[in-house]
Amino acid sequence: MMKRAFRGIVLVLVTAGLALAGSARAADPEKKTADAQKLVVDAGATFDEFWKDRDLEWLRKHKADAKGFLIAPEIVKAGFVFGGSGGRAVLVAKGPKGWEGPAFYSMGTASVGFQAGVSVMTVVAVVMTQKGLDSLMSSSLKFGADASVAAGPVGVGTGVSGIKADFVIYSKAKGLYGGANFEGAVVKPSEDFNKAYYSQDCTPIDIIVKGSVPHNKAADSPLFWRIAK
């Protein structure tokens, strides 16, 4: 009798454990999808904030020349991506059919130079050359090695021409622009976020170059409206 009761308890516990594990697995994709959607919303808000800042005159004057924008709403010191500093980013870029995206990326390195006392910053990287855009279509991009980078000019009437770099990067922390060194930073496609957002396996080439991935334009519209208008 005791043995049967014990076996029954074990069976109930095992069944409950399997059910909880199944629920956790089911919840993970849903959470990742929600995280990807939130990242798109946050990226739109980040771009809008940078765009409206009167000191970022260069950004507004050169938007038409840009091949794309890689936006990271939050880069965290000692982040989760590469063990140093890291965060997620989205790319909206010009493809053969016009503006495409978003494509999702991880950005991080052990050596991004944060200012003293800074632990979080936001980043808008302006893709200025075809080489820069092509490098984002690869499996991994290292700033400074695979593509050149320059800090974005800040101030009205300053540095509005003459920058020769594949990426012009604006960073902001504690309300101030600049101060971060992105030489050596690594950018990689985020396969899990791309899959979660589009509900299928896809690459930045599928999303940006081929424009072959159907997606919810309504969800993307705030980000697209800010960049493609």
Predicted regions and their residues:
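Bacterial N-terminal signal peptides that target proteins for export
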Residues: 1-12
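Hydrophobic alpha-helical targeting segments used for export or membrane insertion
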Residues: 11-20
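Sec/Tat signal peptide C-region and signal peptidase I cleavage site
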Residues: 20-26
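Small-residue-enriched, tightly packed secondary-structure blocks
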Residues: 27-229
